[in-house]
Amino acid sequence: MDYLSLIKQPIEADLADFVDLFNKSLMHSDGLLSQVLDHIRQRAGKRMRPMLILLMARNFGKVSSVTQHSAVGLELLHTASLVHDDVVDESGERRGQASVNATYNNKVAVLVGDYILSTALLHVSYSHSEKIVRYLAELGRTLSNGEILQLNSISNEEISEEIYYEVINQKTAALFEACAGIGALSANASAVEVTAAKRFGQNLGIIFQIRDDIFDYYDSKEIGKPTGNDMTEGKLTLPVIYALKSTGDEEMMKLARKVKSREISSEEIAQLVAFTKENGGIEYADKRMWDFHAEAMNFLDTYVEDRDVYNALKAYLDFVIERKA
C-alpha cells in the first residue's frame, strides 16, 4: 500500500465529509465570485493539512463537527494566504494552474482572498471553541509575520541557520503545528497532549520545508520550477547556508550577497548550486531532516496507541521526508 493510502485509511469517511464541507464553503451564486471560487476549487492538492487535523482528532478522541469546521477554517485561511501570496510574488501559476491574479487581476485576487479569509473565520466560529478561534487568529498573524520576516531576511546581509529556522517556524512549520494542535484541541486532548501534538506538527513542517528547499538544487518537471529558483527570488536556504559557513569561501559569499541584492546572474546561480552540492550542503540538509524525523517518531511512540492511526501518522511522516515533489 502506498503512503497516501495508508494515511487515509483510518479517516477515509471523515476526509470525504471534509471535502464536501470545504467545497460547499467555496460556492457562491454571484457570477464573478462563483467563477473565481470554482477556479480555486479545481486545484485541490493532496489534502495533507486537513488529513493531519483529522488524524490528530482521531488519535485523541474522535472526529466531530468541531474538528470538521476547524479543518475547513484552517484550510480556507491557508487558501486565502496563497491567493494573496501570488499577488505579492507576482506569480502567474499555482499548482500547475494559472493563479487567480493571472487569470483575472490583482484587485479580484485580493478581494476574493479577503472573502475566503472571512469564510474561514465563519467556519472556525462554528466550533464554539474559544481556544480554537484564538489559535486560528494567532496563526493568521504568525503567517503574515513570517512573510514580512522573509522579506526582511532577503534585504538583510546576515546569513545564518538561526534566521532560516526563524522564518520556517513562522511559515510552513506554523501551519503544520496548527493542524496538529487544532486537531488535538477539537478532541479535548489535555494541555500536555496538545503541546506534544503541536511539536510533532512543527517537526513535520520543518521537514516539509527542508525537503522543498533541497528540490531547488535539482531540475524537475514534476516540481515545476528550475534549479536555483529560490536564489532567483533572493532566498538562501539550508543547503547553501551550510556550505558557505562550513567552507568560509569568500568568493561564494560574495555571490550569496548578490543573491540577496537580486543582482546575481543565472550563470552565478549555477556556480553557487554546484558549490553547495560539492561541499556537503545537500547531505547536511538531509541529515537535519532525519534529526527532526527522529524527534517526531518519539511523539508517535509516546502518544499514539491505535495501530491504524500510528501507521497513518508514520506514513505521513515518511511521505513528507521521502516525497519526490
State what each model feature region is.
Residues M1-A325:
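All-alpha prenyltransferase/terpene-synthase fold signal
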